[in-house]
Regions:
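Class I (Rossmann-like) S-adenosyl-L-methionine-dependent methyltransferase catalytic domain
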Residues: 1-4, 21-25, 44-129
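Local beta-strand N-terminus motif with an aromatic residue
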Residues: 8-10
Length: 129
């Protein structure tokens, strides 16, 4: 998790990457991300949900995910909070396969339900220490 960048960003978007970062290196990663955000910058994270059995099966059978260490949403929130990133919004997403796309319009009502294939978290940089 090497981030040698000398710029600041209003938004950092991390899509299905955290599970490839070793759990022992995640704290340093989020410390660096915090430092890369502008004063009122936001971090948007999109990750696999380890509570979804289909996601677990797909990750287990994917060679690209051989090193994957899935992270629960609550653990992601905790490590971000420890690094002064305040949760603004979160939810679970992708409940139905494409064959059931006629259900896609109601997925927004299930954000609270922990069995979505993925989840998202939106954090804001907390400058108060």
């Amino acid at each position: 998790s090497r981030l040698d960048i000398n710029e600041e960003f209003d938004l950092i978007f991390v899509s299905n990457v955290i599970h490839h970062v070793k759990s022992t290196e995640r704290n340093d990663l989020f410390k660096k991300i915090h430092n890369l955000l502008t004063f009122d910058g936001h971090l948007l994270i999109y990750e696999h949900n380890p509570y979804n059995p289909i996601t677990l099966k797909l990750v287990a059978n994917c060679a690209f995910d051989a090193d994957a260490e899935l992270i629960k949403k609550k653990d992601l929130i905790k490590i971000c909070n420890l690094n002064n990133l305040k949760l603004k919004k979160s939810g679970y997403i992708h409940f139905f396969p494409s064959k059931l796309k006629f259900f896609f319009n109601i997925e927004k009502y299930f954000k609270w339900f922990f069995l979505g294939a993925q989840y998202f978290c939106i954090f804001k940089k907390n400058t108060k220490t």
